[in-house]
Every structure is written in C-alpha cells, then in structure tokens.
C-alpha cells in the first residue's frame, strides 16, 4: 500500500515541471488608440486595465502606453473587452447658458460604453503594438501590428484631419 502512495507522489512531482510547459506564452505590447469619430474619448480600458486619457476626435491619443498582455500565438477565439467614456458635456441651464459652480463649469460625464470584440489574426512578425480604433456608432476595432496607424499601408487608415468635423 505504501509503495502505491510513493508511486503517486513521485508521479505528481515529476509532472509538476511539465505543467509549466503547458502554460500559454504571452507578451506585453504597448498600446495606443485612434479615434475615427467626431467626439472625444476621455478614457478607455482594455480588459479592465489601462486608463488612457483624451483621445481627440479624428486623431490619435499621443504616445503609446505599456502594456496589454496577449498570447504570442493568435487563436481564433481571442477577444478583448474595450470600455470607454466620451468627453462629456458642459451642464447648461434652461436658457442654454453654461452652469458655473464655485467659479467653474460643471461637466456632465458621458456614460461608459463597453464592447467585446475579436482580435484579428496576427503572427509573430506582427507583435509590435496593440491599437484600439474607436469607430462611429459606438463600435470598436483592435489590431496587432508593427506598423503605426499613420503608415500608408496600415488599415483602418488614420483619419484625415478635419474629416467628419462640424
């Protein structure tokens, strides 16, 4: 009976190092955002993390931020959840005048919007950075690429300055 217990313990101890081989290898990629709408994106999260602030209409949100973690190898079931908030609006009174409290305008924050979207196929050669694209009608796309959104071969194309603006 004791020999069986010893055999089970030895088997478990031998298998533990192998379990590390079964873990999916991941990589941390810097991320950025491109806004294809005419509204500000004040903040966004990727899978509940992040907090990049102020992605301007029809433009990018400045430098890249570290990091979003992805598997080194793409799989067809990959999805990410993007949650974002618009820039808000200044509170106005019944006459349309901006409300001032304590000497400051009052900002009414936009509600948070959340979408879970597929991650398009990528290869090891694409593992440069992760870009979130805010599209019209509260849609969002993501992309893993070594190209930056301003590159002529990058799709979706970087917004042209002044496009869709009043």
Regions found by a protein language model. Give the residues of each.
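Tryptophan-paired
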Residues: 44-91
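Bacterial signal peptide processing site
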Residues: 22-24
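Short coil/turn motif common to extracellular beta-sandwich-like domains
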Residues: 26-30
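Bacterial N-terminal signal peptides that target proteins for export
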Residues: 1-9
């Amino acid at each position: 009976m004791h020999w069986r217990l010893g055999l089970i313990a030895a088997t478990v101890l031998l298998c533990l190092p192998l379990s590390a081989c079964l873990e999916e290898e991941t990589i941390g990629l810097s991320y950025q955002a491109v806004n294809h709408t005419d509204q500000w994106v004040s903040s966004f999260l990727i899978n509940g993390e992040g907090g990049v602030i102020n992605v301007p209409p029809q433009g990018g949100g400045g430098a890249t931020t570290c990091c979003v973690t992805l598997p080194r190898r793409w799989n067809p079931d990959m999805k990410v959840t993007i949650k974002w908030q618009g820039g808000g609006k200044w509170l106005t009174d019944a006459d349309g005048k901006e409300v001032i409290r304590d000497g400051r305008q009052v900002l009414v924050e936009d509600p948070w919007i959340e979408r879970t979207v597929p991650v398009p196929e990528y290869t090891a050669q694409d593992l440069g950075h992760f870009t979130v694209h805010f599209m019209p009608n509260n849609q969002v796309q993501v992309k893993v690429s070594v190209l930056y959104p301003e590159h002529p071969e990058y799709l979706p194309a970087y917004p042209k300055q002044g496009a869709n603006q009043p």
